[in-house]
Amino acid sequence: MNGTKFLEGEEETDVGLVGACVILGLCFLVGTPGNLLVVWTILKHVKQRSHTVLLILHLAIADLLVLITLPLWIYSLAHSWVFSEAVCKAMVYIINACMYSSVFLITIMSVERFVAVRYPFASAGWRRKQALNKLLVVLWMASFALSIPVIVTHTLDGPPENVQCTFREYTSDTQEVVLLTLETLIGFVIPFITLVVCYGCLFSRIALMNFKSKRKSTVLICSVVVMFGLCWIPHHVMNLLSLAAIALKTTYPKVTENLEDAHTTMTLITGALVFISSSVNPILYMFAARTFRSSLRETGIQKLFQHISSTASAHGNKELSFVSKRQNSHTSTSQCLTETKLPVDLTMEAL
């Protein structure tokens, strides 16, 4: 939310605030119990967790940390910010860090799947070294480091009776350009290009999957990626509008004014979409779990995560067995035949 409130203008304020509160309220009511269910199910019922399930767990935690702040934002929009500026900065800092984490986790899901299919031996090494835990530590540290600028720029503003924690104050146009460019490049452009490349390269492999159950985790992750794009593109389009307004401020002041008006009008919508991205993933998991038969003691989503982990575990044993056989083999023909078959098997097995 860059430098403006959700909505300005006396005639539109009431409608905008009501709309914002309704959207954010729905995000909280749907996303919070949904992500809690995901976290509880994985921690309680999935003992052997594949890389995919671990990434989903961290994604649910990041989304949950964002969503639990929504009641305070709703109250603030409806009335006024009641806490200090330090609390405002701290909350926005945590939200930004968790949103960076969500973006990076979704990106890693795609890269990990790409490596597992296209470079199976590298994937085997990844699993043996248990590098994912170290990568997750680096990911969270990077997310909190990249969010430091909001501590400097975020501030309280507005009339005394309606102070809001939705403003960024930049010391110069240069600072704004640098920070918005970094946010869009690191937080969206690079991750989204990575997602497109990974799934573009895997498209032909995914098309070979004949059994719906074996395609489940791939379709699930693809759905998460698509929703990620739909929810985040508008936010970064607003960043581009801000950059364009700065670039044209001197030569085309009228165009700059129109861009700023468009930015102000769209901020409510883009802000709501960002929070929707944190609440929609559990819905996707439940939709993917709908075909799993469940007993009285097991839920469909529990069966989904167990299925993903069990197929990954079974595949990992198969892969390591293949590596061992390949090292002991003395015929290049058999090696070639086996190497040709493995990527297809990898694609057909859910991570």
Question: Where do the protein language model's features map onto the residues?
Answer:
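Hydrophobic alpha-helical segments of membrane proteins
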Residues: 68, 145-152, 189-196, 225-244, ...
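Hydrophobic alpha-helical transmembrane segments of polytopic
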Residues: 20-23, 27, 132-139, 224, ...
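Intrinsically disordered regulatory tails of 7TM GPCRs
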Residues: 1-8, 137, 159, 250-258, ...
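Extracellular N-terminal segment of 7TM GPCRs
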Residues: 1-33, 37, 171, 180, ...
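Loop architecture of class A 7-transmembrane GPCRs
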Residues: 2-11, 81-92, 96, 119, ...
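Extracellular TM2-ECL1-early TM3 structural module of rhodopsin-like
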Residues: 13-21, 25, 51-109, 116-126
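Class A GPCR helix-loop hinge within the 7TM core
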Residues: 99-137, 202-203, 207, 286-293
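Intracellular effector-coupling site of seven-transmembrane GPCRs
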Residues: 135, 166-173, 183-188, 200-237, ...
